[in-house]
Regions:
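Hydrophobic alpha-helical scaffolding
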Residues: 85, 253, 270, 344-347
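Solvent-exposed loop/turn segments at secondary-structure junctions
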Residues: 88, 178-179, 338-340
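Surface-exposed flexible segments
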Residues: 90-104, 239-250, 350
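Serine endopeptidase catalytic core focused on the charge-relay Asp
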Residues: 133-307, 324-326, 335
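C-terminal subregion of chymotrypsin/trypsin-like serine protease catalytic domains
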Residues: 304-305, 312-313, 324-367
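Short, small/polar residue-rich loop motifs at catalytic or cofactor-binding pockets
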Residues: 315-319
């Protein structure tokens, strides 16, 4: 189908089916939790209410994982991208209705749970415990794209890029890396390397938190981003992408086009997996529900990427990585991923398109 047709179909199905059903599921779970609380006051056993083991009201996620919809391609034709976040929905009447409405022009993948990518930083195994620490997990002066960074209370994330806002220079990464999911305050210290990688205060202080886009808990987000103002005397190299293509250094060539099509080859440098190559598998994905410490959050307008070969494109700790295209232009900011859904049997990565990121922060990319 044509691109416009795929986008129109996606929006209609989201509005008429997916979002209303997800909202209904949330209301049912909240109602069940309230019933549990009421039953507890009355001395009843929680498991007898509604025949299910509803959870306490304050622990019910406000947004439920269901199905994300976007745009994919098959043999040159656009089609509806269907991303199932709860495997139990794979054979549901809802999904069958989506198939029928799309007249079979769908690409369905079970992606399961999606997490922010600053979590699950894995401890070294016996095989890697004595390996040399890679450069992107060490102190880097000048500051480099791809290096370990984080709010002093956050485990570890990645330095995405460097930007200008007014006359000041800032470090770009995710909200959940620099602003601790809105739990930080303006002026908080940013460390490079991050605390998980041994960053200490005051030695590794490189920036102060200045600007971030707050995360919405009950409506759709489009970005997860924040800026740290780089301290006087801390140098940065705003263009070097160390070993980004086939082990060779390249230099960032500015901001890429707003449209990132399926099949495009992309690269990133991240704190955990270093340099990886991937391909875009879907774009304009809406209703992507991501697990954060503050609960499940919904994102619209996202890009989906899978790793090329036998590796995932990202892992926990790669949050905030700048994603560049084949022309080494910035196209997206990595923020989330899962363990399933890619054609190589591994997980998928999700990213904010770079244009909304820069616009929301009123920033200009340095290169």
């Amino acid at each position: 189908m044509r691109l416009e047709s795929a986008q129109e179909l996606k929006q209609r199905l989201l509005t008429d089916i997916i979002i209303p059903l997800a909202a209904h599921a949330t209301r049912v779970r909240v109602a069940g939790a309230r019933a549990v609380a009421t039953a507890a006051v009355a001395g009843a056993e929680p498991l007898t209410v509604f025949g299910v083991g509803a959870r306490p009201f304050d622990k019910v996620p406000q947004i439920q994982r269901s199905v994300a919809l976007g745009v994919a391609r098959h043999q040159g034709e656009y089609r509806l991208a269907v991303r199932v976040q709860r495997p139990a929905l794979l054979h549901s009447p809802m999904l069958e209705h989506v198939r029928l409405q799309a007249k079979g022009e769908v690409e369905i993948r079970v992606v399961g749970r999606i997490d922010k990518r600053a979590t699950r930083v894995r401890a070294a195994t016996a095989a890697t415990a004595h390996a040399a620490t890679p450069w992107y997990q060490r102190d880097m002066r000048p500051l480099l794209i791809g290096a370990s960074v984080g709010h002093y209370k956050v485990t570890a994330g990645t330095t995405g890029a460097f930007v200008k806002r007014g006359t000041r220079t800032y470090l770009l990464s995710n909200n959940h890396v620099l602003a601790n999911e809105d739990n930080a305050k303006t002026g908080d210290w940013i460390l490079q390397r991050a605390a998980y990688d041994g960053g200490k205060q005051p030695a590794e202080r490189v920036a102060r938190l200045r600007y971030w886009v707050r995360l919405k808990k009950t409506s759709a987000n489009s970005v997860d981003c924040a800026l740290g103002e780089i301290l006087e005397g801390i140098p940065c190299d705003a263009s070097l992408l160390r070993g980004i293509v086939a082990g060779a250094d390249r230099h960032l060539a500015g901001v890429g086009p707003g449209f990132l099509d399926v099949g495009a080859t992309v690269y990133k440098i991240g704190r955990t997996t270093g340099v990886t190559e991937g391909r875009v598998t879907a774009f304009d994905l809406d209703n992507v529900v991501v697990n954060y410490d503050v609960g499940n959050l919904r994102f619209d307008g996202q890009v989906e990427i899978e790793g090329i070969g036998t590796h995932s494109f990202s892992d926990g700790g790669d949050s905030g990585s700048l994603i560049v295209d084949g022309d080494i232009q910035a196209v997206a900011l990595l923020f989330a991923g899962g363990d399933t859904g890619a054609s190589n049997g591994l997980g998928l990565t999700f990213a904010n398109p770079i244009h909304p990121v820069l616009k929301s922060l009123k920033a200009t990319l340095l290169s």
